[in-house]
Amino acid sequence: MSAMTRVSEVIIGIVSAGVVSALVFPRYTGEQMRTTVRKRFGSFVDYVASALSGQLDRAHIETIHTRFAYVVGFEAARSMAVFEDPDTRMRSGRLARLNSEFMSASSRFHALHQLMNRLHAAGAQAAIDAIEPYFREIAPLLTRNGEPVRTSIDAAHSAEQLLAWRDALPRRIRATRAELETQPDFPLLDFDTAAELLYRFITDLQEYAATYASLATATHERERWIERYEPRTNKTAATIAGIRTATVILALGWFWIETAWPSGVMLVLNAAATCALASSAPRPTAMAAQMGMGTALAVCTGFLLTFGIYPRIDGFVLLCAALAPLLAIGIYMSLKPKLAGYGGAI
């Protein structure tokens, strides 16, 4: 009977949340996808242009780069939007390709940035002075008439400029290298590495811009793409998560058996759920700590509701009015990445 009650509660919760989401606060995955694609493309292009033109501090470049690490979430949203929106379904292949190309471009740019950091740390100023003029030529390619790239037309224009610039790059690099070979003790290996990374990055960026521009049309040749993004789980991380969960369950199970606590079954079940949720977080320990503190806050809130508010209300409407503010706080916290653990526990 208890199991049937829980199933009924879950079903009612899903139906209620679905009705409210569809009728009261309609937010469609397809629209969110389009907004995310536009925002991410514009932000990344501006970031690259500012970084390569020297407008960003090197430490600030590293901080901004971490904001673009939402590849898995984007792929999950694309998979859901395919069933909801016919326009997204027609562009599904290009969206998957866009995600993969963005991952390649951002990774390549990060590698180039790390190489330049190493050259700065090693004091290889000659190699830096030789390659940086090429960097400063890229920012104008990512604008149209001096304005930032935003629309598909702007992206197509930038893709054409990047392609032409990339095709001319090997010849120019060879000419520069021929001049540098005459200089004794010049770090040619560092220059060659930077030039190769730059060429590969421009190739990835041009592909990314071309795919973004192709989204303006319902059908496009770039839709026919065989590769797919396949997330892979780190075996070491999975093993550690399994050991951590087993240790917690065994410890709490021993405590339950030794104390004969009537609520021990709920303790073990909640611990297993907490370990499962925490294992998917980048920092499982911090997430578990947040969920623990959120649970403590929820207990205090529960005492307040049970003994302070419930005796003074009568009827379903007043019950909703009493619960809504506290539930809203938990939902708000769960939407903030830094507070998600607290909100999820509440």
From Swiss-Prot:
Q: Chief subcellular site?
A: membrane
The set of disulfide-linked cysteines is none
Membrane topology field: Multi-pass membrane protein
Q: Which Pfam families match?
A: FUSC (PF04632)
One GO cellular component term: plasma membrane
InterPro entries named among the record's database cross-references: PHBA_efflux_AaeB/fusaric-R
Places the protein is found: Cell membrane
Q: Which Gene Ontology molecular-function terms are recorded?
A: transmembrane transporter activity
Q: Where are the transmembrane segments?
A: 10-30, 248-268, 291-311, 315-335
Family label: Belongs to the aromatic acid exporter ArAE (TC 2.A.85) family.
Briefly, what is this protein's role?
Answer: Involved in the resistance (detoxification) of the fungal toxin fusaric acid.
- Which protein is depicted? Fusaric acid resistance protein FusC
Q: Which organism is it from?
A: Burkholderia cepacia
